[in-house]
């Protein structure tokens, strides 16, 4: 069984250009995922530079399910008074993605299908009934299905679709490559504002810009929106299984716990993608238990064996609406997609680009990153996270072939691989100082506080940290 994303199967990409000199640009976008590339697409005629700390197509978007639908559990979660606005934003986002794919002939396994929202219990039925009212008052057609896979109740809409998100990103990158300056493996570590210019440090070089847009999923500096105090991170696992028939639907449960979609690859092979659980990150650090539960569920319910399994994390705001737009004058952020990165990332790109272009946008106020977002809930969550932070400082862990030890008042992590070779790293996340937990499933060092991930040699895989935890070997 592998722990790689299904979307990377048979993907070959060339090494991207790396920033190695000081440059000046009108608009600098940090983060070349769904939001960054879509924003660049809308602003491509305005002298845009986009940078990414790694390879494009290997960030958070690559570990999504690739469903594009507005029939979401988030329609009821937290955004009281904004349900209609959120629904319409997701419909517009779906249309944005569809238009980009079709008008640019992007080959990304685009397939029209329909979406189910299903109830697993009577309480879920009540939730769906409320969502029906939201759909009705916005003239959105849906159908009721009393028995969907043995569940209590479900509704479906027909104008949704699925894609291979990695191919979509790479298609966007190719489309933009002649109109936008793109740099990969180029890490932004800090920025300043002087003489009406943003000055961003990247790979020990500097980029001057009039506008700065941060679309890194989780902003790389705490000062960018104070996200650790306004949102939290959830983690879940996705299981990939062989499937014998291409089914033309995707589905989620009304409580948001279960997700199903099907994927037909270029060779005609059919897969089923399934996830059944996500929770706050610090509650999900026992990776082996989570994967075993997922394997048990797929075997018990679908009689299928998982061939590949991988995890993903996302930033959740307390009102379940993204923090996207202008944070300060000419400084923009986009984060907090609450599990729906393809649609929320795309509509965030439209909000930001409309603002820079001087256009009105009906979602600007609702998505405003400066709005109040559950301050009390944020304080409560941070008290819980503080407990995790303190316990991470106190405990010595031993997980399979990895353990944490202390030497000269410095904590280290050691992993011994199948060849009996030792891989030693610093056991402290450079972002905010949490100690790391070894993930036996993905063979990575994971941060339980804000989801930074490092490989066994300390190289950074995911942020918000922008520094590695590598221990430099002493020369003999």
In which residue ranges do the predicted regions lie?
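C-terminal catalytic lobe of FAD-dependent flavoproteins
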Residues: 159, 255, 300-381, 424-425
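Rossmann-like flavin
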Residues: 81-175
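Glycine-rich FAD pyrophosphate-binding loop
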Residues: 45-63
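N-terminal Rossmann-like FAD-binding beta1-loop-alpha1 element of flavoenzymes
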Residues: 25-50
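N-terminal pre-ligand scaffold of iron-sulfur
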Residues: 359-442, 468-476
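Helical element adjacent to the flavin cofactor pocket in flavoenzyme catalytic cores
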Residues: 133-134, 155-211
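Extreme N-terminal leader/targeting segments of oxidoreductases
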Residues: 1-27, 45, 459, 467-473
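Active-site substrate-recognition segment that forms the wall
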Residues: 68, 104-111, 206-207, 214-330, ...
